[in-house]
Curated annotation (Swiss-Prot):
Descriptive protein name: Probable transcriptional regulatory protein CYB_1350
Organism: Synechococcus sp. (strain JA-2-3B'a(2-13)) (Cyanobacteria bacterium Yellowstone B-Prime)
GO MF, one example: DNA binding
GO cellular component: cytosol
Main location: cytoplasm
Amino acid sequence: MAGHSKWANIKRQKARVDAKKGSLFTKLSRAIIVAARNGLPDPDGNFQLRAAVEKAKAAGMPSENIERAIAKGAGNWSDDSPLEEVRYEGYGPGGVAVLIEAMTDNRNRTAAEVREAFSKTGGSLGEAGCVSWLFRQKGVISLEEVLDPEALLLAVAEAGGDDFKVEGTGAEVYCDYSLLEQVATYLKKEGYPVQDAAIRWIPSTEVHVEDPDTAKSVLALMERLDNLDDVQNVYANFEIDEAVMESLA
């Protein structure tokens, strides 16, 4: 998906800037807290936590920050404002479906910020369930580099995965979310450079955005939402042709 590939590149570039101002660390810390709270507070026995910790380390988060986040998730750190996971749904410009995962200590603040992001870009925040039926949860393993797609196809099948999609010089491998750890572990064992492994919402249908102005508004919405400290992940079902993306560059 050209549009999604472009947005992924923008996010990677923005992450380097976010790391400097600390907002990336906030998001990574919250992911660790929730992973530790939902399972064992030990990365060796909690795949979700191990993946979150590895991602934090790759971003350069200090060890003491990681340890503090794990302690918070385990309930061993006093915190007057506990975090809770919330999900928002809405429609962006051109009828694009948008699903947002957030972690917040203040639902009212986060809802207001998300609503403003939609309204500023021509979208609208909807009710729970208005677009989630257009997505399905899948395990997604991001590989940094793939030299032989045919060999990867065989490895994915042997690991228990469903499919993969080449993204630039790398690839994204898809599997049942219950098999995420199994597939990621197998690919690592086979020498594949696993960059990330997470459960994501994958759109079952896509909206093709052909108008440049609409495409610009969609990307503006994605960026506004991703810039919010409380927002962890943003998913959308847009497809933007490469020619349209190039016209916006």
